[in-house]
């Protein structure tokens, strides 16, 4: 049963692009995306604070669910909709501070053991990946594939879930067929020949999520 310690999110967050710049945040919110994550890696807080502030402001302007990857202190300081953390971040993050600030929390997982760890934190949603091979990020684990994804979805029942990793426009329908609540994409949009058309087609398949 879905009983997070953090504020809840809709079961369906819809199409969930993960991007590395404020420019992409603005572009995608302008064309109708309503769940999005700013993921900037390996920079100091002071180097990314201006981008975090700008992204959060855009999220508010478009009434969107804007998640900040990793930089949880900045997310709290500037009142983001939510924070997304990897497994490696859970032990070094003050989860109670995120909870007390009223921010939603998403947690990455790659196997059953990591799902156990995520469930212990009782986040707002659980991300499951990587589903397919991906070039976006170096991954120590093997791709899960659709059958394993479906197994995780069955286990998690009504817990909001997000599939991520190598999901293309062509693969999105099969991913949704597993029962996953949401689909995260990276290169399917940012490396598309026509990002507007790719986003429109993905929105038509996945949707913008529930209110």
Curated annotation (Swiss-Prot):
Which reaction is the catalytic activity of this chain? 2-[(2R,5Z)-2-carboxy-4-methylthiazol-5(2H)-ylidene]ethyl phosphate + 4-amino-2-methyl-5-(diphosphooxymethyl)pyrimidine + 2 H(+) = thiamine phosphate + CO2 + diphosphate; 2-(2-carboxy-4-methylthiazol-5-yl)ethyl phosphate + 4-amino-2-methyl-5-(diphosphooxymethyl)pyrimidine + 2 H(+) = thiamine phosphate + CO2 + diphosphate; 4-methyl-5-(2-phosphooxyethyl)-thiazole + 4-amino-2-methyl-5-(diphosphooxymethyl)pyrimidine + H(+) = thiamine phosphate + diphosphate
Q: Where does 4-amino-2-methyl-5-(diphosphooxymethyl)pyrimidine bind?
A: 37-41, 69, 108, 137
Q: Where does Mg(2+) bind?
A: 70, 89
Stated EC number for the protein is 2.5.1.3
Cellular component, GO annotation: cytoplasm
Q: What molecular function terms (GO) are annotated for this protein?
A: magnesium ion binding; thiamine-phosphate diphosphorylase activity
Q: Which InterPro entries match?
A: Aldolase_TIM, ThiamineP_synth_sf, ThiamineP_synth_TenI, TMP_synthase
SUPFAM superfamilies according to UniProt: Thiamin phosphate synthase
The record's free-text note on cofactor binding = Binds 1 Mg(2+) ion per subunit.
PANTHER family per record: THIAMINE-PHOSPHATE PYROPHOSPHORYLASE, THIAMINE-PHOSPHATE SYNTHASE
HAMAP family per record: TMP_synthase (MF_00097)
Q: Briefly, what is this protein's role?
A: Condenses 4-methyl-5-(beta-hydroxyethyl)thiazole monophosphate (THZ-P) and 2-methyl-4-amino-5-hydroxymethyl pyrimidine pyrophosphate (HMP-PP) to form thiamine monophosphate (TMP).
Q: Output this protein's name.
A: Thiamine-phosphate synthase
Q: What is the lineage of its organism?
A: Bacteria, Pseudomonadati, Pseudomonadota, Gammaproteobacteria, Enterobacterales
